[in-house]
């Protein structure tokens, strides 16, 4: 129904929209009238158990697969709304977009007795990846979408070593585990992939999942922090993290977001030495970024300082394409200078060839 509304009576009382429905969890009772779903009432708490992950193709290039080939370490069941077929361990099941099974809805692959499903048509750094939980296959206009429905703690076993070397110190692995768990909890409420019945994908767009197989050291860190998440005023925080620091962190203003909405993200120096620098000052920032301080924790890593050389034509073409893309997504934020010096939002696809890049102001 066009007037569909959700009433949350568990957390006091709040009016929400269909975008607030959490995929894979039955937290609401739906209201049906005259053959239409016209509303819902949330009356239950979210008890986090599983997360639903879209598995991208080889190279993490797309969520759509031209075909899917899989097998299992134990016997497994392939089912749709209309039929079920049992396969033996080691049997190969293959699906193409024109397979009539997909006309029956989602195809679900469920292993017996804790078996793991190997996706033979996908390659990762570790080789052929295998997955706990179940695998769902759904038809889409551009191919087949693969969704792995897996317990959160099992998901973390293949996230932590994919995001941080398992050879790192145990306390570092524990921190990574807590951050990864918090990130997963937060994105259960993310509706970006709701049309595909998923919460996240397995690439750097979210958290890298199962690029590296699980390791005993990271598994221990996950077990020792089981259930631990980061919160602020009772809410799970958005735990962004990255691999290498330049010697200073930043707040969400780097993405144009309002830093006051995320008070737990604070810009700090990441160093053994005490520094008093104003990095919003261009001269101070230039001196900072063009020098190296051995006291900075990441000073020994290649990406601590880096340079880029780019062909000016290729750079201009890339910028023009991105500029138009940004204009389409947020036209009010892309302003073009007019003849009288004022700035207005208008369609712009090409500013020509870039001649120079300057910084007018640092946040």
Where on the chain are the PLM-derived regions?
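Conserved, single-site charged/polar hotspot
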Residues: 1-363
